[in-house]
């Protein structure tokens, strides 16, 4: 049975505004991640400081979206597809806020590094972060286009992110062995790598929500995972 569209024009505008804010928030997260990765791979402190400063914008969007959802549910009492729209927006904004926090943490640790990174380690970070950046862009496009197939592609790519993360971890461990007097930098790099992977995990969370939004049901089966991670991360 086809779900009947709502008829209140102002309500439709409110939903459009909610969707627009999700896309804007996602855009800020994309920008933060890009700057954070550039900061650590090129030791660009200006980019790192910009990510830390601009995280407040992402936090404000989460608060705004949360208030919009509360108002929509309380005043409009949405049903069916409209209820999925509002609930999904709330969950996606939560994941985006965490992605912003993780980008900020990468930037904070970048500012604490004492030495320039060897090329092999920079290359490993770029490989995994490049895939995560593509993943984030793809899922925002999937949300915008209401594409369940794009959401599935992002969901399935999580395994590759895990594997690239562990390759990066191996490079960090090699760096630690070669720089035993610089355990501080090595520790920061382990957490940077794990935070990049966690951004991928939260992007995959968004993929599950987009699929639910479009299909009205959750993805079946266990989330694809790569090899076991070496260390745990942080928010």
Stretches with model-predicted labels:
Residues 1-235:
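Cytosolic, long alpha-helical scaffolding segments
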């Amino acid at each position: 049975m086809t779900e009947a569209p709502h008829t209140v024009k102002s309500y439709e505008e409110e939903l459009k505004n909610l969707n627009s804010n999700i896309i804007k928030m996602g855009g800020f997260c994309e920008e933060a991640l890009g700057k954070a990765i550039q900061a650590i791979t090129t030791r660009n402190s200006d980019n790192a400081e910009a990510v830390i400063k601009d995280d407040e914008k992402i936090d404000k969007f989460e608060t705004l979206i949360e208030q919009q959802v509360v108002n929509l549910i309380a005043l409009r009492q949405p049903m069916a597809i409209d209820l999925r729209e509002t609930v999904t927006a709330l969950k996606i904004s939560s994941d985006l806020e965490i992605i912003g926090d993780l980008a900020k943490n990468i930037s904070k640790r970048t500012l604490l590094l004492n030495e320039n990174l060897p090329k092999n380690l920079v290359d490993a970070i770029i490989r995994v972060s490049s895939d995560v950046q593509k993943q984030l862009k793809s899922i925002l496009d999937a949300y915008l286009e209401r594409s369940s197939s794009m959401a599935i592609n992002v969901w399935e790519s999580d395994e590759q992110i895990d594997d690239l993360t562990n390759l990066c971890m191996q490079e960090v461990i090699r760096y630690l062995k070669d720089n035993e007097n610089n355990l501080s930098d090595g520790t920061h790099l382990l957490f940077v790598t794990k935070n990049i992977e966690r951004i991928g995990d939260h992007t995959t969370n968004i993929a599950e929500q987009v699929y639910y939004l479009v299909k009205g049901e959750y993805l079946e089966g266990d989330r694809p995972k790569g090899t076991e991670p070496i260390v745990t991360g942080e928010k």
